[in-house]
């Protein structure tokens, strides 16, 4: 089936740098052209140039409506997810099942880390677009399945579908005729960090080649468009699927909104999925489980436990929360769910990665606080450290402070100081010029000559706009003012410039 007719395709190529609003208003001028389709495609390509450059560089890609393009993963975040699943292994391995295929951006990147891949999507039209785009992108190891992943009967039948379609000797997955050979993957600077991002065991056995990784990106809005705050409220209900998924899934990867409480999500997954002390008698008999491991326990629990949490930011803006859970079934018959690795937390902002143990990240320990004298007694050689958005979301400030030997400015400021420059700190670094109380005379002296300033507030009783009005400064310039509450409860302004 032809998705775009020749006239419309030619129109798209000839106008893809034009203003789509003007094209839409002049639709009557273009006879024989599906202008609505053309506008969607032109707008999609223009967005892809910024967000998905490898897609924009590929002729023949069909794009969804603008809102879907804005909501889909970027090439940066999709590439990071591929690195997480690929680990340090050599070449493609195992089977990927993406149960929430959508536009197929994540799938198109993830699938290249696997020998075989299955895209599942309940929208028939999206399946048609995905099948076409995968062919254009040269993805030749993928099968497209039109199904609803919230249907428990479908999930329970997935092992049979995989067996029927993909375990035919070494043929790989069935693909459409005319599929091109896979294109070489683009290099990414983030590959330099791969050794620090994940620890994945390597195996050259046939069993490893057939291990299943399930990817889920549950919808985070209800039918009224309201944002959900718990994974229990997302669709499909991940927790409800865990027992069925544990029958055949080795690794589960959840892509969630960074607005969700990751602490609660980890607790819910572990509570629903992990049996720490496994009794063989409590296992489903092997006849009732898949061939390469045990299924859920008799009480209906699965055997998943969270192995890593990844908070992914791009240019200091949190984009995604990734939770990776491992199936304990391979060790369950031998005494429990112990892993050969310690569950980890990764805070990622472009090329900067800060990691710690997940146990440490979930603790709430106090941070040592510094004393910041104001006025003439204020320190002028100290550096101010502002954690990036990924670390802020993780909330592991005590780990950060201990690792980099920095002190907090206040108990809830999430600003840190040290008397030295620190290489690799996950965030921004400023040189403190002065520290001022809110005393009018002291403010006048500390801000003498400052007409422009960038202002941020942390645990401070005034808004940025109200403070700017009081200080009588306009936005911009090379001065950065951080208004906060320090250890003794007083309100201060930390006046800084970017460290060089």
Where are these regions (language model features)?
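SAM-dependent transferase fold signal centered on methyltransferase-like domains
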Residues: 1-500
């Amino acid at each position: 089936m032809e998705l775009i007719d020749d006239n419309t395709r030619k129109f798209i190529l000839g106008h893809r740098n034009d203003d789509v609003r003007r094209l839409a208003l002049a639709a009557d001028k273009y006879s024989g052209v599906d202008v609505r389709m053309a506008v969607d495609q032109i707008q999609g390509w223009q967005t892809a140039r910024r967000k998905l450059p490898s897609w924009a560089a590929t002729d023949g890609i069909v794009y969804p409506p603008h809102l879907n393009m804005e909501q889909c993963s970027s090439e940066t975040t999709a590439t990071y997810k591929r690195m997480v699943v690929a680990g340090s292994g050599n070449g493609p391995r195992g089977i990927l099942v993406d149960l929430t295929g959508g536009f197929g951006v994540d799938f198109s990147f993830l699938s290249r880390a696997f020998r075989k891949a299955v895209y599942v999507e309940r929208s028939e039209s999206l399946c048609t677009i995905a099948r076409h785009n995968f062919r254009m992108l040269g993805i030749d190891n993928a099968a497209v399945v039109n199904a609803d992943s919230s249907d428990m009967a479908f999930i329970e039948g997935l092992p049979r579908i995989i067996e029927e379609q993909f375990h035919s000797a070494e043929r790989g997955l069935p693909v459409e005729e005319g599929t091109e050979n896979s294109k070489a993957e683009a290099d990414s600077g983030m590959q330099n960090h791969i050794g620090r991002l994940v620890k994945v065991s390597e195996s050259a056995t046939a069993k490893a080649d057939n291990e299943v990784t399930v990817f889920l990106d549950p919808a985070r809005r209800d039918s009224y468009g309201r944002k959900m705050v718990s994974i229990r409220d997302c669709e499909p209900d991940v927790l409800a699927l865990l027992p069925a998924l544990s029958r055949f899934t080795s690794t589960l990867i959840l892509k969630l909104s960074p607005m969700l409480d990751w602490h609660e999500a980890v607790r819910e997954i572990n509570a629903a999925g992990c049996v720490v002390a496994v009794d063989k008698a409590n296992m489903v008999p092997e006849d009732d489980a898949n061939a390469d491991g045990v299924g859920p326990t008799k009480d209906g629990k699965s055997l998943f436990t969270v192995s890593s949490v990844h908070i992914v930011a791009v240019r200091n803006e949190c984009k995604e929360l990734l939770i990776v859970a491992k199936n304990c079934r391979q060790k369950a018959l031998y005494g429990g769910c112990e892993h050969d690795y310690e569950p980890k937390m990764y805070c990622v902002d472009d090329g900067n990665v800060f990691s710690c143990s997940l146990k440490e990240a979930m603790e709430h320990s106090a941070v040592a606080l510094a004393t910041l004298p104001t006025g003439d007694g204020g320190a002028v050689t100290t550096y101010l450290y502002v954690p990036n958005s990924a670390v802020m979301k993780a909330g592991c400030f005590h780990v950060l402070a201990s690792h980099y030997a920095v002190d907090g400015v206040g108990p809830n400021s999430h600003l840190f100081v040290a008397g030295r420059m620190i290489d690799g700190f996950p965030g921004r670094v400023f040189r403190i010029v002065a520290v001022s109380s809110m005393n009018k005379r002291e403010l006048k002296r500390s801000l003498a000559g400052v007409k422009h300033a960038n202002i941020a507030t942390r645990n401070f009783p005034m808004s940025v706009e109200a403070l700017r009005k009081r200080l009588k400064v306009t936005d911009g310039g090379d001065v950065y003012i951080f208004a906060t509450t320090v250890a003794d409860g007083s309100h201060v302004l930390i006046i800084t410039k970017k460290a060089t």
